[in-house]
UniProtKB/Swiss-Prot annotation:
GO molecular function: single-stranded DNA binding
Domain of life: Bacteria
Keywords noted in UniProt: Plasmid
Record protein name field: Uncharacterized protein pXO2-81/BXB0111/GBAA_pXO2_0111
Entry-linked InterPro entries: ArdC_N, LPD25
Amino acid sequence: MTYTKKKYTPKTKEQIKEETKEIMDKVLTDITKYYNSPEDMLELANFMAQFSNYSPRNMQLIKSQFPHAYACASFKTFKDAGFHVNKGEKAMKVFHPYVKEFVRDPKTKLPIPLTKLTAEQKQQVKNGELKVEKQTNYYLKATAFDISQTNASPEDLPKIFPNRQFNFEVTEENKELLKLGIQALAEKENIKIKDMGQGALIKELGTIHGAYVEVADSSFAQIVMNTRNTETKELSVAIHELAHAKLHNKKVASLEHVPTEEFEAELTSYIVCKHYGMDTSEASVPYIAEWTKNGQDIEEKDKSIMRVHETASSFINTIDKKISELQREREKNREQNKKEIEDVYVVRYGALTSTEEKIITVRELRERADRDKSYSDVENANTLNDKEYIEAFNKANEENCIALEHNEIKKLMVVIQWSEADLEKNKAIPFGEANAIMSKRIAEIDAESKRAEEKGEYVPYEKTRYHLILPKEMDKDFNRMEVVTMDRLDLGDGIYKSPYEQILNEKRQLSDEVKQALQQEINEYEQTKGQSNPEKLRAVNTTEISEIQQGKVDRFLSNKTEKDEDAAAIKQQEARRMARMAYMQRMER
């Protein structure tokens, strides 16, 4: 018997185009089925939380081909991470965008691709006489594989996706990481998050968990949080309000429909929280239920879902990246902490500017702390490695002394012994950073004092005691660390604008090498933070400008609005805020 090989006939462009359109239409229809009830919508949201790096269309397409998909990527992504697709596995098809750029012929109105423009037409585009338009088409290509189709295991996910989080659990340690991730997101969006009360645009929120507030005729905006929130509630509310800031700020065309705005913010929060292992469905269902029955047409609901997905995906990517960076940094620190520390430099604080210093081994420090009752006890000391023990020792004895790693400190450091300001105490901080922190606080007090003086009030200065630590490399004779104890620095008393000024004025006997190192530390810190002028050792002007802006906000808070403020805009802003609060209170009930 003979077999005739079946001849393969490739599909025409028209057939491929028609097939893509049919699948696209089906996918979009399938997505709309989730709009019918809160339960269906939560199912879609859960999939969004898992596959935030794919569009809603592709998520639905993946789900239809591989219902139990867990973590998908291209063949190349798995290969680059050192893994291979198992033999016989079939790739999932996903939509790939293809963007066409063109201009329209002024006479015929027909599109002309940018690649076929004449020199004259290119010049017209450059001059703005011809407008470039974009058209996005999609084509199907089998490029996605699930991790279960490869030789990789869930433990390998960090290698495949180095900046993404999987199976994130909200432990105490991870809760702090998530807070820092949300803070990084707020900084990226240029939004300040404040607790209600002093310095916030709203003094009292009542039963409202949080609010996004904008100042009319200003770029100033704030998220105000209710101090009565639980720790978990704080996280979900912060994301909800950041979604408002992203989707419904005055630079974006407002929907002017409170239920839809609240739905978009709440669903964004639900998706992001779900990605990090938090179930906020109990709070989200009322918003979703209101939206599913609000009578909007399918097209408007599609737009809402696309906005939510884009925002949630952006938020997750930013937070994931920050958390992954912090985890890698902590893992690196853990590895370093496993190494034994040879010597520590123990500084005991005396009266006024006196200190007692000596170099001992960590073992000696442990023994002394155990038998000498002038030291405070370190809990579970036997279970701690050297690095952990020193940190715990310094925390337990912050009023009396500090132990510094003699061989690890390679640059000028500052230890704040005590302060009336909210400054981190009994920890070695790089001089450039410490100088910037205290300079900023001095500038803040100066600005507060000016405003208080206008009202006949007084703002007290904040007494601070700190020590300058010189690394042993600066001691050419004995090769040992040195402590320079400063007179008390009163932040905001008008004498010094920075610790740097105080040190240069009061410790003139310091060598030129030390003085140059002080300036270099400041310059390097300012350059790292992206400040434009490394020679400028006082950051007062910048801070004062921000304080002037804050002063405008304070005047807004007390209803003493500037004469040139648009009263109508303020009224509209307040009306929208009140409508939001009323709606949220109703949802809470």
